[in-house]
Amino acid sequence: MSISYSGHYPIERRAGEIERLHIQSAAMAPDTRAMLDLIGVKDGWSCLDVGCGPGGITGLLSERAGPNGRVVGLDMDAQFLEHARAGAPANVEFRQGDAYRSDLPSASFDLVHMRFVASTAGDPERLLQEAIRLARPGGTVALQEPDGTSLNCHPPHPAWERLKRALLGAFSGVGADLQLAKRLYALARQAGLQNVQYRPFLLEVRSMDPMVDYLPSVVESLRSTVIKLGLLTEAEFPVVLAECRSHLRKPETTFTMYTVAQVWGQKTR
């Protein structure tokens, strides 16, 4: 996911980043489906996925919007969008644009969704107001955002803790907030959304699961920021990654991901 050139998203382009995002999306798909079911996304809806990256939830939205509906994925990253367009369903289109100030027309979507955007881009209030602008009167604005404090490994390991500190420190160091989940419900209400709903979930990962490499791989994508901020040195970086990966692949090791808060509400008519 790329937010905009004016945002604070510190994750870099590297080999494997698209695959990492697809694995993340697949792991979160059951809970995303549950949220979309509760919202009531149905045939004929017009839906927008803000910060869709190489696909985001556009596939899940496409299934529900059907042939009479429309799904738009918005992102700034041309390479992500090129990947997303390959094999996209007929009712899905992708546009390059800034999540803070897209050129999409006001009041044009039944659903505006963003995941891990408001927490990482540095100005969640501004992003939420743009999402509300794009929603139709009576339409739904939905967000999924993390609380990084629930990242925990069992049994504990020093390398895990160092990578966790590097991850949280890299985002906070550029003005992002990986604990936005804690205030997301209040943020939605303060923005004027009505009938605001709240559904948190927590992913648990074992050594054989596709998400097992999540923490090392995302810190790899933060390499420049991590080193610039002094969270790890050049020499420490590969050593800590290797030690953490070795621990995560032990059969008895498990870890919990972020707690993800799903929050959605309706735009007033």
Residue ranges and their predicted role:
Residues 1-18, 22-23:
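N-terminal, positively charged/glycine-rich alpha-helical extensions of SAM-dependent methyltransferases
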Residues 26-45, 60:
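Conserved alpha-helix/loop element of class I SAM-dependent methyltransferases that forms part
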Residues 48-102, 126:
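Class I SAM-dependent methyltransferase SAM/SAH-binding core
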Residues 100-111:
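A short acidic, Gly/Pro-enriched loop at the edge of an enzyme's catalytic core
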Residues 110-125:
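A short SAM/SAH-binding and catalytic strip from SAM-dependent methyltransferases
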Residues 125-140:
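A short glycine-rich, Lys/Arg-flanked "PGG" loop and its adjoining helix->strand segment in the class I
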Residues 142-209:
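Conserved catalytic/acceptor-binding region of the Class I
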Residues 179, 189, 197-269:
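Conserved Class I S-adenosyl-L-methionine
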